[in-house]
């Protein structure tokens, strides 16, 4: 990475920190900028700036989240000192989708911090940030489609399954494995974009067309073959079968288990790709700040699921599916040469995460904030009702 680029990243990080910090902490932002400017070694200055960013950003984000999530009534209620985190958790349960957007954005930024430290090409950072913009734009557009009441869920689910099958049959191949399509010179992995969305949606909206879509997706994973995505199917559907078994889940689980078994027959010999695979380990070898950025970003991916599980009794199946999907993606990246979702280079998982947020409730019951949870009691939190958007 050139000296000029390092200094630009330092300036960008300082500007982002100053824009995020609340007024009482603004002096810390200026102090970090001045200290970084006084460090002659550009690499050390960049590491100092990113370390300071990781140290101060949680407090800044906590302050902003409290403002974003707090209800108009809650803003006028006195809050006891030292309860900021608890208020954020309580308020976030009212807007699970917004919480997911915050987690996704934070994870992408942590991933770009890792790539900057690792010396990745500037284009890689731009690809991930561009994918974030595309994903959030699609999320906004599909939310509007949901409000318009278009009932095209079943047809679009079948179209997504068809896209996965088409990738297996006609996609770009490497060592006999067909998982990718090229768009604008960039390799995209449709399974990372579509499969998480299909699985989280299936947890809410189960019928024959949805089951056929999942079975077709399982066939596609066996044909590609893609062991990581087949494992995602098995892990998610097993969790749903334990939570709320029915004939649709059992049928889809049987097909997914057969798909995963088929992927085990053939060895997956694809080598690790820099900035994409195995970065959970290599980042710590590079620098502790880089490793913590990767680890923190991955942990953020399951935060909506953890909070939803604890606070939303009636929506638990949705949050279990969401958490199982992204836990499976993280597990695959940790165990083999598979893409590290969101924090590694590649836009497919970023777009896929954004789309999977559509299956989470946009708003939850305000009663969840009225009182703190009591021992043995579970807050009531209704779901949004039947899903009316195919990608949701």
PLM feature segments, named:
Residues 103, 113-213, 218-224, 327, ...:
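Membrane-helix boundary/helix-loop-helix interface segments in multi-pass membrane proteins
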Residues 158-171, 190-225, 232-243, 252-258, ...:
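Alpha-helical transmembrane segments of multi-pass inner-membrane proteins
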Residues 128-138, 288-306:
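Hydrophobic alpha-helical transmembrane segments
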Residues 1-86:
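Negatively charged linear elements and acidic catalytic determinants
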Residues 248-273:
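A membrane-periplasm/extracellular boundary helix in multi-pass inner-membrane enzymes
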Residues 3, 84-104, 152-153:
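N-terminal membrane topogenic signal
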Residues 355-392:
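A juxtamembrane structural motif centered on a specific transmembrane helix
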């Amino acid at each position: 990475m050139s000296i000029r680029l390092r200094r630009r990243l330092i300036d960008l990080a300082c500007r982002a920190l100053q824009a995020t910090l609340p007024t009482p902490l603004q002096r810390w932002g200026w102090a970090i900028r001045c200290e970084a400017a006084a460090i002659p070694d550009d690499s050390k200055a960049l590491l100092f700036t990113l370390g300071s960013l990781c140290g101060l950003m949680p407090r800044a984000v906590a302050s902003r989240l409290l403002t974003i999530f707090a209800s108009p009534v809650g803003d006028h209620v006195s809050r006891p000192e030292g309860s900021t985190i608890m208020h954020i958790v309580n308020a976030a349960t009212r807007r699970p989708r917004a919480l997911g957007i915050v987690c996704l954005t934070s994870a992408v930024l942590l991933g770009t911090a890792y790539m900057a430290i690792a010396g990745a090409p500037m284009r890689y950072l731009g690809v991930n940030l561009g994918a974030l913009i595309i994903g959030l734009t699609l999320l906004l557009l599909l939310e509007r489609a949901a409000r318009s009441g278009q009932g095209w869920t079943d047809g679009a689910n079948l179209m997504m399954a068809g896209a996965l099958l088409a990738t297996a049959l006609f996609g770009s191949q490497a060592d006999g494995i067909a998982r990718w399509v090229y768009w604008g010179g960039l390799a995209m992995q449709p399974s990372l974009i579509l499969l998480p969305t299909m699985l989280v949606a299936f947890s809410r909206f189960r019928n024959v067309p949805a089951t056929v879509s999942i079975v077709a997706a399982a066939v596609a994973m066996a044909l590609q073959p893609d062991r990581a995505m087949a494992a995602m199917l098995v892990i998610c559907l097993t969790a749903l079968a334990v939570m709320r078994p029915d004939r649709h889940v059992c049928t889809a689980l049987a097909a997914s288990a057969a798909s995963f078994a088929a992927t085990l027959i053939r060895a997956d010999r694809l080598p690790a790709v820099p900035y994409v695979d195995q970065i959970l380990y290599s980042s710590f070898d590079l620098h502790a700040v880089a490793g913590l950025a990767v680890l923190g970003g991955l942990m953020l991916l399951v935060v909506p699921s953890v909070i939803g599980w604890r606070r939303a009794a009636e929506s638990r199946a949705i949050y279990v599916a969401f958490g199982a999907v992204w836990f499976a993606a993280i597990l695959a990246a940790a165990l083999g040469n598979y893409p590290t979702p969101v924090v590694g280079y590649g836009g497919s998982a970023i777009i896929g995460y954004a789309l999977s947020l559509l299956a989470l409730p946009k708003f939850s019951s305000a009663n969840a904030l009225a009182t703190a949870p009591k021992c043995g009691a579970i807050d009531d939190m209704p779901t949004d009702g039947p899903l009316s958007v195919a990608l949701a």
